[in-house]
Amino acid sequence: MLRQYKEQIKSSPQSCGVYKMVGDKNKVLYVGKAKNLKSRLSDYLQFENLSERIRVMLLQVIKVEIFITENEIEALLLEAQLIKSLKPLYNIVLKDGKFYPYITISKHDYPRIAKYRGKFKKNEFHYYGPFTSAAAVKQTILSLQKAFLLRVCSDQYFSSTKRPCIEYQIKRCSAPCINKITKDDYCQSVKQARNTLLGRNKEVKEQLLFTMRKCSSEENYELAAIYRDRVKFLEQIQIQHTDFSFEKDADFFSIVREEDLACISVLSFRNKDNYGSTPYFAENCGDHSNDEILSTFLVNFYNSANIPPIQIYVPDSIVDKEIIEQALYKVAQKPVKVLHAKNKKERDLLKFVYDNSQHSLEQKLIDYRNNLEKLEELSKIFLLPNIPKRIEVYDNSHISGSQQIGVMIVAGQEGFLKSEYRKFTIKEKFSGDDYKMMREVLTRRFSGNIKGIIPDFLLIDGGPGHVSIVQNVLEVLNINVPFACMAKGPDRNAGNERFYMLGREEFSLANDSKVMLYLQSLRNEAHRFAITSHRKKRDKQFIVSQLSKIPGIGNKRKKALMSYFGSVKNISRASLAEIQNVPGISKGLAEVILKYVNYKRGVLE
């Protein structure tokens, strides 16, 4: 530890504030808060009492920057803001987990049933779940289709089709798209499906049995048989229903951890509606207690885009409860209480969140260990100095040299890091020259906004000719990163891939080896991202240019449409009334636009 760093700590003020540990090239290593800065920073001078991770960090520290705040609340909020913007290497790292799958029933005039993951859109769907198994969701939807003949097609397909699809032919849909069922009867089926998902199976079954017996007594045996089959399929649906309702706006939190990794789940209620349970993962937790992790998480969670409810339930006591409540008051502009469960209902909801956290953490660790095993083997095969934490994969896409695009995907020890993916629209006109395209992509990547983030390994979709291109770019930019080029076999199919590296003979791997399958999955993901990115770019350019061909649509109206909706995709999803809201668009013209845009998208898809 440098002498000047020690002197800086000794001269720090005995006041409340935030401190930054800064390393080489002004890289922020850690951000912390303290009620007494001098006292807190002096703890770091007790080197032998610190954990190995903190000792390693301190050896990299060149200076400490201090921000004095008026009180602990300001320090808490500033710390959260700096951690979010700077992403220091040694702070607790918070990441979104996978959303649990839900079953949704849309609020369309003829509702659709579907599986859904992601953030809730309460104005568009009713949500049922969560389910811990995607297979359970799929099976439940299938049984609900058979029992109630609900549609699963997209709204776009529903509005444009002229004949029933295969789902109608195999008796899994009542074909409301072509009026094979009345709206009232279809909505009655939807209501019964919703009641089933709410755990009211017995009530629905009695309704179906009553209708079946009525049809039978009227000698309408064909219809009676249909209702008999519905009852049979209904009995196959096993939904463990728990009362996931709460009268007040509230969030329920739970934390489960194993060594350096913690999973925090939150179950949210707003306006008496269940907004679902979402897992988040916190890394670098080894030096922190559960209550410290949860305290940090709460401030970060609500200091971003989430508005705190009036009640927040946590399993145990947390650090600085009163200060956190005051900080959240500043965010919400209303009193916020951090509470413990007092009754059975609250305890049941906390237990549910805890069980979700436990399940999510177990799955995360299984995925992590599987990935780590592959990465250890990969580091040996490709002679890497360390097990890679960040792998970047590059691919290009174009059509006959036009609309050229390059992509970068990122994978780490926890899997694909999709928030790190990047697209590069090729600026120069290279007429499909893959080498020049790759040179531009790599140059922009390592001299652009994220140039400070250096990967541990590069995988290039290319052959021996790409090796010198990559080497030249890295040398010019003074970057030392191991890389390999991966070329497909003779028939350009998966299998018999060849690898090319600087200073090594070309080599191949066994087609069934774990590393080979892993590298193929990386290459395929990069290829998928390149193709879909290119398709979106191409489709957008095509359809926007085609808008001008609609009779009555000139540049002024085209600009008005794109300004109002933002994209052609949004136009295709809009209602007739919404399109009419655009200045200069009449009802007749709105009808033409809607038909045209939906037709063009259908052709492209």
From Swiss-Prot:
Keywords: Cytoplasm, DNA damage, DNA excision, DNA repair, Excision nuclease, SOS response. GO terms for cellular component: cytoplasm; excinuclease repair complex. The keyword Transcription regulation does not apply. The keyword Cytoplasm applies. It is found in: Cytoplasm. PROSITE patterns: GIY_YIG, UVRC. Disulfide bonds: none annotated. One of its GO terms (biological process) is SOS response. SMART domains: GIYc, HhH1. InterPro entries: GIY-YIG_endonuc, GIY-YIG_endonuc_sf, GIY-YIG_UvrC_Cho, Hlx-hairpin-Hlx_DNA-bd_motif, RuvA_2-like, UVR_dom, UVR_dom_sf, UvrABC_protein_C. Residues 202-237 form the UVR domain. GO terms for molecular function: DNA binding; excinuclease ABC activity. Residues 14-92 form the GIY-YIG domain. PANTHER family: UVRABC SYSTEM PROTEIN C (PTHR30562:SF1), UVRC/OXIDOREDUCTASE (PTHR30562). The UvrABC repair system catalyzes the recognition and processing of DNA lesions. UvrC both incises the 5' and 3' sides of the lesion. The N-terminal half is responsible for the 3' incision and the C-terminal half is responsible for the 5' incision. Interacts with UvrB in an incision complex. Belongs to the UvrC family. This is UvrABC system protein C. It comes from Wolbachia pipientis wMel. The lineage of its organism: Bacteria, Pseudomonadati, Pseudomonadota, Alphaproteobacteria, Rickettsiales.
